[in-house]
């Protein structure tokens, strides 16, 4: 029996092959989309996944403003943040956030599904969100994928 073939392979920084993928978020449910995007950013869809390395792909999401929330979450869900000052607790709904910055709700959803450490902070920088149908990353030759292909 050849024991060499049963060893777990761990990627090195030079072995990582990062790709660029485009996802159209029109009429996709926020949480389902965010979960799949976090999976691709992390690299868990690849057989060469290594937990401590940034081995995921760069993800471009178009039409991030057209993402859908089920039920009455657009007005009833509440995001809570704190300014750091006494009495500084602030509340906002997805509708209010999307009025100011259309891509922020999707960014917060994906960020919440990534690791809460330095790797997670690095991974969120591989996410590119655009409210419209255009993006400036044509030179990277991104491939278009749907949620079912992930």
Regions found by a protein language model. Name each.
Residues 1-108, 118, 136-150:
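Ribosome large-subunit tunnel/peptidyl-transferase-proximal elements
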Residues 106-107, 111, 124:
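Hydrophobic, well-ordered secondary-structure segments
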Residues 120-130:
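C-terminal structural segments of small proteins and small subunits
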Residues 129-137:
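Short, highly charged C-terminal tails/helix-capping segments
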């Amino acid at each position: 029996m050849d024991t060499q073939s049963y060893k777990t392979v761990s990627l090195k920084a030079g072995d990582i092959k990062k790709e660029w993928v485009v996802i159209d978020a029109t009429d996709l449910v926020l949480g389902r989309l965010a979960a799949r995007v976090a999976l691709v950013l992390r690299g868990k869809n690849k057989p060469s996944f290594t937990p401590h390395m940034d081995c995921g792909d760069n993800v471009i999401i178009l039409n991030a403003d057209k993402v859908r929330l089920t039920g009455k979450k657009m007005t009833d869900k509440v995001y809570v943040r704190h300014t750091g000052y006494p009495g500084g607790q602030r509340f906002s709904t997805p509708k209010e956030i999307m009025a100011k910055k259309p891509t922020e709700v999707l960014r917060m959803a994906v960020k919440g599904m990534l690791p809460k450490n330095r790797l997670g902070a690095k991974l969120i920088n591989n996410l590119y969100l655009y409210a419209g149908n255009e993006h400036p990353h044509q030179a990277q030759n991104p491939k278009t994928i749907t949620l079912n292909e992930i």
